[in-house]
């Protein structure tokens, strides 16, 4: 099994972090650490989405239809 988490797992982890921070029941140090983890997850999620978009564009171009996605 791959060590890399799936997109859905990372998204769920990010949602837990956001919920913790929104509740405000964490100490400042923990809030900062959670925020940093959340930012890292956010970047990983965005990279996954960008990669998926490029894959779709490539597939669509090979099919001869759409050449650009926005």
From Swiss-Prot:
Q: Does the keyword Hydrolase apply?
A: yes
Q: What is its EC number?
A: 3.1.11.6
Q: Which SUPFAM superfamilies match?
A: XseB-like (SSF116842)
Q: Which Pfam families match?
A: Exonuc_VII_S
Tell me the keywords, alphabetical order.
Cytoplasm, Exonuclease, Hydrolase, Nuclease
Q: Which GO terms describe its biological process?
A: DNA catabolic process
UniProt GO molecular function: exodeoxyribonuclease VII activity
What does the entry list under GO cellular component?
A: cytosol; exodeoxyribonuclease VII complex
Catalytic activity, reaction form: Exonucleolytic cleavage in either 5'- to 3'- or 3'- to 5'-direction to yield nucleoside 5'-phosphates
Cellular location(s):
Cytoplasm
Give the matching InterPro entries. Exonuc_VII_S, Exonuc_VII_ssu_sf
Does the entry feature the keyword Nuclease, yes or no?
Answer: yes
The role this protein plays is:
Bidirectionally degrades single-stranded DNA into large acid-insoluble oligonucleotides, which are then degraded further into small acid-soluble oligonucleotides.
Q: Which family does it belong to?
A: Belongs to the XseB family.
Oligomeric state and interaction partners are given as: Heterooligomer composed of large and small subunits.
- Please give the name of this protein: Exodeoxyribonuclease 7 small subunit
Specify the taxonomic lineage. Bacteria, Bacillati, Bacillota, Bacilli, Lactobacillales
Gene, per the UniProt record = xseB
